[in-house]
Every structure is written in structure tokens, then in C-alpha cells.
A protein has these predicted regions:
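Plant-biased, solvent-exposed loop and capping regions
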Residues: 1-944
Length: 944
């Protein structure tokens, strides 16, 4: 009886502790405190009022205890709804909290270490926020944690020193640390191997090193999803991978693995997704895929395979050809046609075979694939005509890519499609000159490429207010006319390319959502004042227009601006100093304007520019000292300005990544310092048309010009290959001023012409095997041509004209098999012109004009056998030695004079009668001359 009373009393006391309003008062206050430190721009937490916190949005409580067990504040809307502020430690009052999701918000703080004290936490998601700093070791205290997502942070400054804390999370099933910097973590694999319950591991773009070593024992064999994309691979695929027999999803994209795809891959029979994009595999299509009967998603893009595409597809699993949903083979060197294999894969949803060498017409069976939503055939060699007949079969199609083939798309103006495309890529598809009105039906369009189609129409009025969801628009390389409408600013565009058209008028208000804008090569005029700020812009190209005025300060308000190209306009004034403080700026091109003053000296203090081009302006002053900080600089083009003074010695010590250095047409003076030879990546050096003097020092460290292989800066190549920027390099080669664009990084040139250099031509030039152009003309070089110049196998143009060179032209120059231009004019060369091989084709006599002691073809002067013409400058041998022919000529003249003199004068001296007769005759002639003059004067006087 006593026990019954005691039990009843305990139940009553326990019932009194339960929350009357369904919420623990202390936890309600903790949530209010948490809200107090949060900025809520969209008022998402407006429901956080009243006594019962269990009814607040994002809050869930235990049905019995009333304690908060779940807090889900994930932002599922746009960025304008993101919470920001601080994550308050008041969350520690939620002692039973098992689920915490703060993802996709804008919390700008480090990972709170106090989260490691929430012992009951099973789910923690902080992904897609601005959280930064080191991941705290305290997270290792969450022994009940099953789900941890720290991936895809909006900031790029979250990292881990080690992952030892991870070993304590024995219950963990899901781990996402994508985009977390793990480059310094060497024990990541050992830590993961301590997690026996792990089913999903995502470490993409984390900088981890993937070694090919094996593990003594594999503990994480329950793994079903493995994402290591963009890891650093040291060799081939790791051996421990083949023990993960439950693996269903494997992503090893962008890892640079080499060699063959191992046959052990076929042991992973549970695989349904294999993503091996962007690796360096070789050989034929892997037979290892044949046993994978569950395979539905296969991506083998950009892996270096080649051969007949039909032979490849024979190696696909025969047991699953009718269940494969996604097939991506783009970016290889596949050839052949689509006949006989593609139309048989009836379950295909997405096909991408772009950027190959596939040929033939597109089979009608491909257009009839019933499930197809994406078809990308771009950048191949397909041919034929695509009409509305073929397109009408594709009822479910959402993405269509036909760009850059030999295809012709012919669709009637009044055709109404039976499907609704989201992506259209019809670049270079020979569309009609009229703008295609049939695309008006695709109101949900997000991507439109109609570039390079010779469209010469105006954009219809419906265009700008139809595609409200359009994010990418490329109409470049057409002949489209008109002005930009005001409606443009209301579109959702992210990338806009209208370059190489005939648009005109002032710049209109632009969408604030723009990240890339290309209006180059049009007829836009007016000032550069863009009516609204472009806060999200990354690349901005307005080159080759008629823009005037100054560069506005408002352009400095674009914090992400990495590429600014305003070249070839009529912009004047000074460059705003604030532009130099743009931290993201990598490419600055202000060439061919009317700018003056100085380049902002803060340009390299915060950013890491790759290209600075200010050529053909009116900048002045000494060589910019701020460039000493530009250690990442790859291209420096200061050509045709008013810079003066000496070149500093730190150029070779600080600009260690420079590839193109163009200082042509300035007023630099002094000599070239030896430190310039430290520029080991230099490919183009142009110091021509300055006042430089002295001799050429040893520059033998130009290893790029002497190496057998070329290496390029990946960051710069990404701009060129994407089409965002094209550096136009102007060089004088083969006596012509030429412009190089896409091939600018393939040119190797040294131009020191039109200076005051003296001394001998250094022999190190002969070691620059990759050099294509060498111009030393219009200087004061002396001595002989080094014979080792014949080793410059890549040399195409050699100009040594207008110097003081002498001696014989070396026979070794005949070994220059690539030489197509040669100028030796106006020197003091002597002897026979060498013949043979490539020199035989250079038969223009003007090549050697101004060298009077040269003989032999192509000159009309024949060489005497066994005779050698030589000339030595006064510097080498004062007085000189005359040739035999000239010596005899002078002797003959002297003898003739002596003989003639004594024949006349000697006779008069020796014979008296001859002498008297001679002088008598001269006296008579003189007398008659005087009488004649006197008579003429008398007649003139009488006439007056």
C-alpha cells in the first residue's frame, strides 16, 4: 500500500514539472536570446512570439517532455531571406536538441566551439553559410552525431588542421566537407577508416591528396556514396577503393588520375553512378564497365580517350543498355557517327557528346528517343539540315545543343513547338537573317545561344519582356542592330554577350544580377556612366566602341570585378585611384585610349593581377614602382606611352611569372641589367624604340625560350578559352606589324631594335631554341655573327640590319629550316653569301643591300675564286688593309698622274724654243682677250 502511495506521489510531482503551455520556459528564453542576435531581413522569425515556443516556425518539441529537439532554420528561399548575425551560445540551454540546421544563411562567424557541448545532437548542418576559420576539435564530443554537413561554404576560408576529432564520431553516417580546405590534413583517410557506420562521404574540392596506397584493414565498407572530385591524385586509382563493394555512387572527377581504368572497377557491382570526368586516362573504352549492370549514370567526359565511338559503346554493360539514363562522353577525341548505337538506348534521359570529332547526319532515331530531355551535340562535325520535323519528335526535350557543327537549322517563322525548352544552343547553325520568332514559345528559357549566325535583323520588341527567367544570353558575332532598351534592366540575366554586332547609342540600365557583360566591338557611344551599379559583375568588356569621357568612380563599387577591358575607345582623363584597390581584379586592359597621368599605385597591394595593358595612351613618369608587388603578373604591356628613366633591377627579381613584357615606343634609357635574365617564363620581350644603350648582358636564364615544351598559366588560359578575354599582342616581325590574338601564348620573340645597344651579339641567343623572332636592327652592334645562331631551330624571322657588324655571314644560318624572313642590310659584311637549304629560298637581293664587300647570289656581284673579301672596322685594326683590286687601282691613278705631268711640264723645262713659243702664245691670247673686253665695254657705254 505504501509503495502504491509513493508511486502516485512521484507521478503527481513529475506531472507538475511538465510545461503547461507545451514549452520549457528556460528554453523559450534561450530561443528569444538566440533571435536577439540575429538579423532577419525577411522577418522569417515573426512567429517567435507567445509562450508556446513549440509552435514557432522551425522549432519542434518532444511530445511528452516538451523540450526542444529540433531547430530547422534552413533558408529555402533566395539570398534576401538569409539570416545573418551571430550564433548565440544560448542554444546550450536546449539540452535535448537532436537536430540543428542553419544552412543556406549568411552567418559570418567561425564554427562555434560550444556546439560540441550539445551531447544529444544527431544532425548538424551548417553548409552554404559564410562560416570561416578552423573547424573546432570540440565537434569530436558529439558521439551521437549521425549527420554532419559543413560543405559548400560561401566563404573560402574554412579549413581543418587535422581530422583526429572525426575518429570519435562512431555513429556518423553522412559527412560532407566539400570545399573545406583540407590540404594540410594528411590523415583524412585514417580518420575516415575509423567510421564503421559511414554511408556517404563527400570531400569534393577540398584539396585532399589521394594516394594510391592500400590500407591494412578497411572499416568503412558500408560506404554507398563517395565524392572525392577535384582531389590531388598522386598516381593511379587507390587500391582500397575496390573493397567498397556496397558503393553505389562514385565521383572521382577532376582528379588527374593517369593510366588505364583498372579492371577491378567491375567488382563494384552495386555502382549506379560513375563520374570520372577530367582525368588523364588512356587507352580504349574500359571493359571494366561491362559487369556494372546497375549503371544508370556514366560520365567519361574529358578523359583523353579516342577512337571509334561505336566501338566504345560495345563495351557498355550489355545487361543494362536499356536502363542507362545519363551518358556523357564530351571533350574526347571520338570519331565516327551516331548510327547503330545511340538510337537503341531507349531509356536515355540525357546525352552529351559535345566537343568531339563525330561526323555524319544525326539519325532520325535519335530524335525519336522517348525519354530524352537533354541532347548536346555541340562542337562536332555533324552535317545536314535540322527542321521542325526532327524537333517535333522530342516531346520531353528541355535542353538542345547543336552549336559549332556543319548543321543548318531551318524552321518556319510560324512554327509552334510542342515542347518547352529551357536551354537552346544554336550557335553557327546557319539560321535565317531574320531573328527566329519561333523561340518566342519558350517562355521558361534560361540559356539562349544564337551566336555567329549572320542575323542582320533588329531584336523584336517581344524579346525583352518574354524571357523573364533568361540567365545566359549570347547573340555575339551577328549583325544585329538597334539600341539597348530600358526593359533590359528588369531581366534576370547573369551572362550577357552582345559583342561583334552593330548595336549603337548610349549604355542602358543593366540588370543588377549580371556577373558577365560583353558589349565589345559595337558602336556604343556616350559616356561610361552606367546608370545602376553592377555589384555582382565579374567580367566587364566594352572594348572597340566609341565610348568617351572618363572612367567613373562607380566602377570601383563592383567588389568581384576580375576582368575590366575598356580598350580601343576614346576614354580620357586619369584612372581612378580606387580602381587599384579592387581585390579581385586580375585583368586590366585600358589600351588604345587617351588616358594620362599615372597607373594607380595601389593596383597590386590587395589583388593579384595577371594582365596589365595600358598601351597606346599618354601615361608618363618612371617605370611604375608598384609593379614590384605584382608577383603574379603574367602580361605587362606598356607599349607606346611616355614612360622614361632606367629599368629597375627588381623586374627580374619580382616579376617572376611574367610571360609577355612589352615596353616598345617609350623613352626608357640606361642599360639592360643582368637580373632581367631571371624571367624564366618570358616568351616575348619587346624593348624596341627606346633610348637603351650599352651591351647585352648574359640572359641565359630565359628557360622558357630554350625549353622543348610550353607551359601556360591555367588562370589566364581559363579566361582565353572561355572567351571572356582575348589578349591582342602587337609585334613587329618579318618587317610587318602583326597582331596576335589566340596564338599570343604560342609566340616567342625578342625585339631590341631602334636603340643604342653596342658590343657584340651575345652567343646565348643561339641557345634560345624556341625563339621565333629576333630583331636587333637599328643599333650599333659590332663584331661577327655568332655561328651558334644556326641552332635556333624555331627561328622564323631574323633582322640584324643597320648595325656595324662585319665579317663573313656564317654558313650555319643555312640550318635555320623555319626561317622565312632575313634582313642583313646596311652592315659591313664581306665575303661570299652562304647558300644551301633554307637560304636558297631567300633570294631577294635587298636582304643584303648596303654591304659593299658581299658577293654571290642573290647579289649580281660574282665572287673571284680563291679570293676572300674582308673588312675590319677601325675599332679592330686602325688604318685597315685594302683589297688587291683597290690597291692596283690607286697605283694606276698615281702613275698616270706622274706620267702626264712630266710629258707636258718636262718638255717645257727641257726645250727652250718650245718654252718661248708656249709663253708667247699665251701672251697673245691674253692680249686679244683684253682688247675684246674693252671694245664690249665701250659699246655698252654708248648705248646708255
Amino acid at each position: 500500500m505504501c509503495h502504491l502511495l509513493l508511486s502516485t506521489l512521484l507521478i503527481v510531482l513529475w506531472a507538475q514539472t511538465l510545461p503547461i503551455n507545451g514549452c520549457i520556459d528556460g528554453e523559450r528564453r534561450a530561443l528569444i536570446s538566440f533571435k536577439g542576435r540575429i538579423i532577419d531581413p525577411a522577418n522569417r522569425l515573426s512567429s517567435w512570439e507567445g509562450r508556446n515556443c513549440c509552435k514557432w516556425q522551425g522549432v519542434e518539441c518532444h511530445n511528452i517532455t516538451g523540450r526542444v529537439v529540433k531547430l530547422n532554420l534552413r533558408n529555402t528561399n533566395d539570398d534576401d531571406s538569409a539570416l545573418n548575425g551571430e550564433i548565440s551560445p544560448s542554444l546550450l540551454q536546449l539540452r535535448d536538441l537532436m537536430y540543428l540546421d542553419l544552412s543556406s544563411n549568411d552567418f559570418a562567424t567561425s564554427v562555434p566551439s560550444f556546439l560540441g557541448s550539445l551531447k544529444n545532437l544527431q544532425y548538424l548542418n551548417l553548409s552554404r553559410t559564410y562560416i570561416f576559420g578552423t573547424i573546432p576539435q570540440h565537434l569530436g564530443n558529439l558521439s551521437n552525431l549521425k549527420y554532419l554537413d559543413l560543405g559548400n561554404m560561401k566563404s573560402e576560408a574554412i579549413y581543418a588542421d587535422n581530422l583526429n576529432w572525426l575518429m570519435h564520431l562512431k555513429s556518423l553516417k553522412y559527412l560532407d566537407m566539400s570545399f573545406v580546405d583540407l590540404m594540410d590534413v594528411s590523415n583524412w583517410l585514417a580518420a575516415v577508416n575509423k567510421l564503421p557506420s559511414l554511408e556517404q562521404l563527400l570531400l569534393g574540392v577540398s584539396g585532399i591528396t589521394i594516394r594510391s596506397n592500400s590500407l591494412p584493414h578497411i572499416n568503412f565498407t558500408s560506404l554507398k556514396v563517395l565524392d572525392l572530385n577535384s582531389g590531388i591524385a598522386l598516381n593511379t586509382l587507390p587500391l582500397w577503393l575496390w573493397n567498397l563493394t556496397d558503393l553505389a555512387h562514385l565521383d572521382l572527377s577532376y582528379c588527374s588520375f593517369k593510366g588505364l581504368i583498372p579492371h577491378e572497377l567491375g567488382n563494384l557491382r552495386s555502382l549506379n553512378t560513375v563520374l570520372l570526368r577530367d582525368n588523364d586516362f588512356k587507352g580504349i573504352f574500359p571493359k571494366a564497365l561491362n559487369p556494372l549492370c546497375n549503371l544508370t549514370n556514366l560520365d567519361l567526359s574529358y578523359i583523353g580517350f579516342s577512337g571509334e565511338v561505336a566501338m566504345w559503346t560495345k563495351e557498355l554493360p550489355s545487361c543494362n543498355r536499356n536502363i542507362l539514363n545519363v551518358l556523357k562522353l564530351s571533350g574526347n577525341n571520338l570519331n565516327g557517327s551516331l548510327f547503330g548505337w545511340l538510337e537503341k538506348m531507349t531509356e536515355l534521359v540525357s546525352v552529351d557528346v559535345s566537343y568531339n570529332s563525330l561526323t555524319g547526319v544525326v539519325p532520325i532515331g535519335v530524335w525519336k528517343l522517348p525519354m530524352l530531355t537533354k541532347l548536346d551535340l555541340s562542337n562536332n562535325l555533324f552535317e545536314g539540315v535540322i527542321s521542325e520535323v526532327e524537333l517535333s519528335y522530342m516531346k520531353k526535350l528541355k535542353e538542345l545543343g547543336l552549336s559549332a557543327n556543319n548543321l543548318t537549322v531551318r524552321v518556319p517563322k510560324d512554327w509552334t513547338p510542342t515542347f518547352n525548352l529551357l536551354v537552346i544552343k544554336l550557335g553557327s547553325c546557319r539560321l535565317r537573317r531574320e531573328f527566329p520568332s519561333w523561340i518566342k514559345s519558350f517562355t521558361e528559357l534560361t540559356y539562349l545561344d544564337l551566336s555567329n549566325n549572320a542575323i542582320s535583323d533588329k531584336l523584336p520588341s517581344w524579346f525583352w519582356n518574354t524571357f523573364h527567367n533568361l540567365q545566359n544570353l549570347d547573340l555575339s558575332n551577328n549583325q544585329i542592330q538597334g539600341r539597348l532598351p530600358v526593359l533590359l534592366q528588369f531581366m534576370a540575366l547573369s551572362n550577357l554577350n552582345l559583342s561583334f554586332n552593330q548595336f549603337e547609342g548610349p549604355l542602358a540600365p543593366l540588370p543588377e544580377s549580371l556577373t558577365s557583360l560583353d558589349l565589345a566591338n559595337n558602336f556604343f557611344s556616350g559616356s561610361l556612366q552606367i546608370p545602376n551599379p553592377l555589384l555582382n559583375i565579374y567580367t566587364l568588356r566594352l572594348s572597340n566602341n566609341n565610348i568617351v569621357g572618363t572612367i567613373p568612380i562607380s566602377i570601383c563599387k563592383s567588389p568581384y570585378l576580375s576582368l575590366l577591358d575598356l580598350s580601343n575607345n576614346n576614354i580620357s582623363g586619369e584612372v581612378p585611384a580606387c580602381l587599384g584597390r579592387s581585390q579581385a581584379l586580375q585583368i586590366l586592359d585600358l589600351g588604345s585610349n587617351n588616358l594620362l597621368g599615372h597607373i594607380p599605385d595601389s593596383l597590386c597591394s590587395t589583388g593579384m593581377p595577371l594582365v596589365i595593358r595600358t598601351s597606346n595612351n599618354h601615361f608618363d613618369g618612371p617605370f611604375p614602382s608598384f609593379l614590384k608587388q605584382c608577383t603574379t603578373l603574367m602580361i605587362l604591356d606598356l607599349r607606346q606611352n611616355k614612360f622614361l628613366g632606367i629599368l629597375p633591377d627588381w623586374i627580374g627579381e619580382s616579376l617572376t611569372n611574367i610571360t609577355i613584357l612589352n615596353l616598345r615606343n617609350n623613352m626608357f634609357s640606361g642599360s639592360i641589367l643582368t637580373q632581367l635574365g631571371q624571367l624564366q617564363y618570358l616568351q616575348v620581350l619587346d624593348l624596341s624604340h627606346n633610348n637603351l644603350s650599352g651591351s647585352i648582358p648574359l640572359l641565359a636564364n630565359f628557360s622558357k625560350l630554350s625549353s622543348k615544351e610550353l607551359e601556360f598559366n591555367d588562370d589566364f588560359l581559363s579566361y582565353e578559352m572561355s572567351g571572356y578575354y582575348m589578349y591582342y599582342m602587337v609585334l613587329v616581325t618579318k618587317s610587318e606589324e602583326l597582331q596576335f590574338s589566340k596564338t599570343s601564348l604560342l609566340v616567342e620573340s625578342i625585339d631590341l631594335s631602334a636603340n643604342n645597344f653596342m658590343g657584340e651579339i651575345p652567343e646565348f641567343f643561339g641557345k634560345l631554341f624556341k625563339l621565333q623572332n629576333l630583331n636587333l636592327s637599328e643599333n650599333h652592334f659590332t663584331g661577327k655573327i655568332p655561328s651558334n645562331l644556326g641552332n635556333m631551330k624555331s627561328l622564323e624571322s631574323l633582322d640584324l640590319s643597320m648595325n656595324d657588324l662585319f665579317g663573313e655571314i656564317p654558313q650555319t644560318l643555312s640550318k635555320l629550316t623555319s626561317l622565312s624572313y632575313l634582313n642583313m642590310s646596311y652592315n659591313n659584311f664581306s665575303g661570299k653569301i652562304p647558300t644551301g637549304d633554307q637560304l636558297q629560298t631567300l633570294n631577294d637581293p635587298t636582304i643584303y643591300i648596303g654591304n659593299p664587300y658581299l658577293c654571290g647570289p642573290p647579289l649580281p656581284i660574282a665572287c673571284f675564286s680563291n679570293s676572300t673579301h674582308s673588312y675590319h672596322s677601325d675599332n679592330e685594326n686602325e688604318g685597315g688593309l685594302l683589297s688587291v683590286e683597290w690597291l692596283w687601282m690607286y697605283i694606276g691613278l698615281l702613275l698616270g698622274f706622274v706620267i702626264g705631268f712630266w710629258v707636258v711640264c718636262g718638255s717645257l723645262l727641257l726645250n727652250r724654243s718650245w718654252r718661248y713659243a708656249y709663253f708667247n702664245m699665251t701672251d697673245n691670247l691674253f692680249g686679244r682677250f683684253n682688247v675684246t673686253i674693252a671694245l664690249l665695254l665701250a659699246k655698252l657705254c654708248r648705248k646708255k
